[in-house]
Amino acid sequence: MTITPATHAISINPATGEQLSVLPWAGADDIENALQLAAAGFRDWRETNIDYRAEKLRDIGKALRARSEEMAQMITREMGKPINQARAEVAKSANLCDWYAEHGPAMLKAEPTLVENQQAVIEYRPLGTILAIMPWNFPLWQVMRGAVPIILAGNGYLLKHAPNVMGCAQLIAQVFKDAGIPQGVYGWLNADNDGVSQMIKDSRIAAVTVTGSVRAGAAIGAQAGAALKKCVLELGGSDPFIVLNDADLELAVKAAVAGRYQNTGQVCAAAKRFIIEEGIASAFTERFVAAAAALKMGDPRDEENALGPMARFDLRDELHHQVEKTLAQGARLLLGGEKMAGAGNYYPPTVLANVTPEMTAFREEMFGPVAAITIAKDAEHALELANDSEFGLSATIFTTDETQARQMAARLECGGVFINGYCASDARVAFGGVKKSGFGRELSHFGLHEFCNIQTVWKDRI
């Protein structure tokens, strides 16, 4: 049988080009079996009490820590994340389990209120089995930050993972099995687009959550809407990183490099458009380029390397095409900008200057290690440039004037604003975007309540 992406999910080591695994797409019988298991699992799981479910989250965290190095190595092998960053992803995911186990039950308590001397209570009920379509860039964290609160709320979770990280998908499933999560409460399926469509239409799927591209999110969201099913979309970003004249330059440069080049730049909420007030632009650019040039890139298994390969060769080629288009439009290349020779999908830290709003690097998401620098005349101009985007995931402001920063934050069209620090997701705060970056929220109590039936129970209402 010929193996192609049309028939199989294919995992390829992005550092070497070695084929790691192939897995056939799920057929109709596989999908039906998964949905039957999910329906049965949900019926039983919804009847368990919240304290039991919280304790099972702790068990998931323990099981994940027991396989921490195995999981980190799998992440690095399948999608090229530098090993230290992969280990951090595993640790963060395990800590998420503990945080929701400790704080989640209180977030799901009934909320009584008095209504005209009568009793009304808001209850947080399970919704059903949630279909999750997840990406490859954080192959563990993206799954866990959805699955953990979804399962705590009494729902089931059915995963369709990205085809290039099937090893990660299998290992995550093993972690949940190790923790004693019943079959059907957590499940995964290697489904293609047709299989996803079939599941969205099925009555045993209650809702859908997607992390991915705008194109994928729009397509899946349309199908969920046609089926009248709730969905949460966490999509792309072209996040602005604003540096004003009074900023702490050293701190701003350090945060800018970390915010842009983490995970080899393959982060939806990474800083991508660097909007620098003209009085500090020259000094910032000089230091930023020097710091980016000092980053070590190479074998992601080597702990000394800060950047690894990009996850797929087609993604690297697309990124390079965007760079070439931006240069042809008049931008200036200060660093990088060339595909690396030899094995692996390597692309060097790249810095583009003189980027203006009509250019590709400003208008499109650059999903890789490319920074685009745009000069702003003043703070008001910086704000206008930041909002001049179809995306609205996060934004950063560097300034020593906190009052001005908070005033700007109120006018930024995005889901999260970070003052004197770069964007990161955290269990304690909501994460999500506006505009074409999607809708709905993950994490904190907002993420926990997204997939609850928020039910009003009103006594003596006549």
From Swiss-Prot:
Its EC number is 1.2.1.16. One of its GO terms (biological process) is cellular detoxification of nitrogen compound. The keyword NADP applies. Keywords: NADP, Oxidoreductase. One of its GO terms (molecular function) is succinate-semialdehyde dehydrogenase (NAD+) activity. The keyword Hydrolase does not apply. Pathway: Amino-acid degradation; 4-aminobutanoate degradation. It is an enzyme of class 1 (oxidoreductase). It holds the Pfam family Aldedh. The active site is at E234, C268. NADP(+) binds at W136, N137, K160, H161, A162, P163, G212, S213, L235, E365. It catalyses: succinate semialdehyde + NAD(+) + H2O = succinate + NADH + 2 H(+); succinate semialdehyde + NADP(+) + H2O = succinate + NADPH + 2 H(+). SUPFAM superfamilies: ALDH-like. Disruption phenotype: Cells are unable to grow on 4-hydroxyphenylacetate. Optimum pH is 8.2. Activity decreases sharply as the pH is raised above pH 9.2. InterPro entries: Ald_DH/histidinol_DH, Ald_DH_C, Ald_DH_CS_CYS, Ald_DH_N, Aldehyde_DH_dom, ALDH_GabD1-like, GABD/Sad-like. Catalyzes the NAD(+)-dependent oxidation of succinate semialdehyde to succinate. It acts preferentially with NAD as cosubstrate but can also use NADP. Prevents the toxic accumulation of succinate semialdehyde (SSA) and plays an important role when arginine and putrescine are used as the sole nitrogen or carbon sources. Belongs to the aldehyde dehydrogenase family. Homodimer. NCBIfam families: PRK13968.1 (NF010575). This is Succinate semialdehyde dehydrogenase [NAD(P)+] Sad. It comes from Escherichia coli (strain K12).
